Amino acid sequence: MSIDSRQVAAGMLDAVPFARTLGFEFVEVAPEAEGGVRAVVRLPDSPATHNHVGGPHAGAMFTLGETASGAVVLAAFGQVLDRAVPLAVRAEIAYRKLAMGPVLATARLGRPAAEVLAELEAGQRPEFPVPVRIATEEGKVTSEMTVVWTLRPN
């Protein structure tokens, strides 16, 4: 699988203006073993996104993780967007440690893309998880989340 990370980043920033508003930076969108996809998105340190203790606001971190998961979905399933709409179905986040400074969300496809596509081809509405880890630039995990996505046939 070949992924044009610049095209994925541009597509996400075009489709989700809120990601531009928060200043997200797309660090990497890359294939992984067995048809997997990984996306890394960065939230710079900015007073505009701080909470009451001076770190990134929980809502900004949630949006960062959801955006990274969306980049995974776009990279993995962009070829079927003419016949299916990707939608987040549900998400859960656990805030583990206080985050300070810039944070990075690393999202990975939680199910083989081929399985998801086979369900879509069979006329189903597949669901699949995208686990996300949010960490400081030093690698300290501050949050973990899972976003469950679907591909809704047109």
Where are the predicted features?
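Non-catalytic linker/capping segments at the edges of enzyme domains
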Residues: M1-R42, A48, D82
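Short structured motifs
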Residues: R20-F26, V89-Y95, E115-L117
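A generic structural signal for short beta-strands and their flanking turns/coil linkers
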Residues: R20-L22, V37-A39, L87-A91, G101-V103, ...
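Residues located in well-ordered beta-strands
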Residues: E25, E92-A94, T106-R108, R133, ...
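A short, structured loop/turn motif at beta-sheet edges
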Residues: V29-V37, R96-V103, A135-K140
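Hot-dog-fold acyl-thioester-processing enzymes
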Residues: P44-A71, L81-D82
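Hydrophobic beta-strand-centered segment that forms part of the acyl-chain substrate-binding groove
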Residues: V72-R111
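HotDog/MaoC-like acyl-thioester-processing domains
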Residues: A99-M100, G110-N154
